[in-house]
């Protein structure tokens, strides 16, 4: 159902069963998939592609220009998967040509009120962004990561899968998979064991991850020496391989 008071560009492509509430504005070069619900007073600009079964609440701004002073109106994109929820006043920006030109959001994510995803970010699946999370540009967030309220993330940071960021954390370094961090600046506070249990990790897998955490953070080893030990463990433990691969891909150093 399209409310008569909504303003929709003739160039927008909406599936027949999309719902758009009153006073929302859908711009040209926007594609919205089946059963997606756009609430009242929402703005969606493009080029933006939104998948199926998404829910966008009032006052959200989806797919507008990046907040980057170098941006000069280039035709960059935003791509959103399926079954995401964007609560009140979320802001999700398109990419820039200084990166891949696209901001990417996976599926089954929850973005609570006033959360902000900046240009060129890559968000995985099943993440939670609590109220007023603020992301810099070019940030990567792995699957199942949870970011508490008022978390602030510096540009180019990588947050690993299953990581947990406590409320108010200020992050300027990469967070490895499975690790909990909190504080300003954010520092590690152990393994997100409860989250791993809820997602079906076995006791043995969690024990291996705890062992890896001790090697990385509690052994007084240099990072290169810790990485050598972790690499040996990863040969038979896929959950440790994910940690090793993340460390190799880190460009801003790890929280310590």
What are these regions (language model features)?
Residues 1-5, 10-11, 16-17, 53, ...:
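Terminal amphipathic alpha-helical/low-complexity segments used for targeting or macromolecular assembly
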Residues 2-182, 186-187:
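Structural signal for interior beta-strand "rungs" in well-ordered beta-sheet cores
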């Amino acid at each position: 159902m399209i409310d008569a008071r909504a303003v929709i560009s003739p160039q927008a492509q909406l599936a027949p069963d999309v719902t758009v509430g009153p006073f929302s504005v859908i711009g040209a070069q926007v594609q919205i998939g089946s059963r997606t619900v756009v609430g009242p007073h929402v703005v969606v600009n493009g080029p933006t592609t939104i998948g199926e079964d998404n829910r966008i609440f009032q006052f959200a701004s989806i797919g507008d220009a990046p907040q980057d002073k170098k941006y000069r109106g280039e035709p960059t994109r935003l791509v959103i998967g399926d079954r995401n929820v964007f609560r009140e006043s979320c802001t999700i920006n398109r990419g820039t040509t200084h990166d891949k030109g696209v901001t990417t959001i996976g599926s089954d994510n929850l973005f609570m009120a006033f959360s902000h995803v900046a240009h060129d970010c890559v968000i995985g699946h099943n993440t939670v962004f609590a109220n007023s999370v603020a992301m810099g540009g070019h940030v990567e967030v792995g699957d199942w990561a949870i970011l508490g309220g008022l978390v602030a993330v510096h540009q180019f940071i990588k947050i690993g899968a299953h990581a947990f960021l406590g409320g108010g954390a200020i992050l300027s370094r990469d967070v490895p998979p499975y690790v909990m961090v909190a504080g300003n600046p954010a520092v590690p506070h152990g393994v997100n064991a409860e989250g791993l249990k809820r997602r079906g990790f076995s006791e043995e897998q969690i024990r291996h991850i705890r062992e890896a955490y001790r090697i990385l953070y509690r052994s007084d080893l240099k990072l290169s020496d810790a990485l050598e030990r972790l690499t040996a463990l990863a040969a038979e433990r896929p959950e440790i391989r994910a940690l090793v691969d993340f460390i190799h891909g880190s460009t801003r150093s790890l929280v310590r």
